[in-house]
């Protein structure tokens, strides 16, 4: 798929039948269109397209929006904006890390923009932060256009591995990590494997007893069929605790995104009641204070509407 210039009336689609039409840049506007949310689209007014490129894996675009600052788009789908990225990055990171005492070794799968790294670095107990991102272009673009997000790469505890996250995990010795955070895009294209049962089995093997995983888990308004499958797989694989939490992100489809929070068999993990507060003051001057996460919103994120609660609490039991 080639993303059209916003001064062109092309709708952003190619003629290749194998390449789905998943976005368009019409005069002055970017519209996010995807088969994952049929019948609806979210649009942002474009001031200027800052970058367009095609990596070995996906189309990459950055544009300056009128209301949400700079926007990172992969294969036509918004990944982050300067205005609301905090709601996603802080929650996917601190929900797991604030639920266990003194995490020391953390692995991030995906997350090439560096935002999760930034948030992991707030935890002073952490000694090693590994990240495996498949697309080098995402890392380079983030460092160039989103320095306040990519600041996470400046932490000396960070070890960057460019490659496939599934293959990386298979080579990790069993019980290596206290926490694994899977910051994936939607389950199409290069991220599809990150939503499948064998991947979760590999994560469980890489975690210590009582270790935790946090993974992007779609929207309860749009993807309950995907969430059902994820929950069923996680209940089968993770013998500790399995929970679904969510947060609001205005520029994500339906305005929200969910997370699976799971732990391996071992020391009990109560995700709903954080026990490991962040020493935010010690990092505030370097990466800025928290904008979204706090202990109250941590606990509230596990409260589900009735229709989702019925499905999630019964699936796999």
Swiss-Prot record:
GO terms for cellular component: cytosol. Belongs to the spermidine/spermine synthase family. It comes from Datura stramonium. Residues 27-264 form the PABS domain. S-adenosyl 3-(methylsulfanyl)propylamine binds at residues 58, 89, 113, 133, 164-165, 183. GO terms for molecular function: spermidine synthase activity. Putrescine binds at residues 88, 183-186, 252. HAMAP family: Spermidine_synth. It catalyses: S-adenosyl 3-(methylsulfanyl)propylamine + putrescine = S-methyl-5'-thioadenosine + spermidine + H(+). Keywords: Polyamine biosynthesis, Spermidine biosynthesis, Transferase. It comes from the Eukaryota. This is Spermidine synthase 2. Transmembrane segments: none annotated. The keyword Transferase applies. CDD domains: AdoMet_MTases (cd02440). One of its GO terms (biological process) is spermidine biosynthetic process. The keyword Transferase applies. It is an enzyme of class 2 (transferase). Pathway: Amine and polyamine biosynthesis; spermidine biosynthesis; spermidine from putrescine: step 1/1. Its EC number is 2.5.1.16. InterPro entries: PABS (IPR030374), PABS_CS (IPR030373), SAM-dependent_MTases_sf (IPR029063), Spermi_synthase (IPR001045), Spermi_synthase_euk (IPR030668), Spermidine_synt_N (IPR035246), Spermidine_synt_N_sf (IPR037163). The active site is at 183 (proton acceptor). PROSITE patterns: PABS_1, PABS_2.
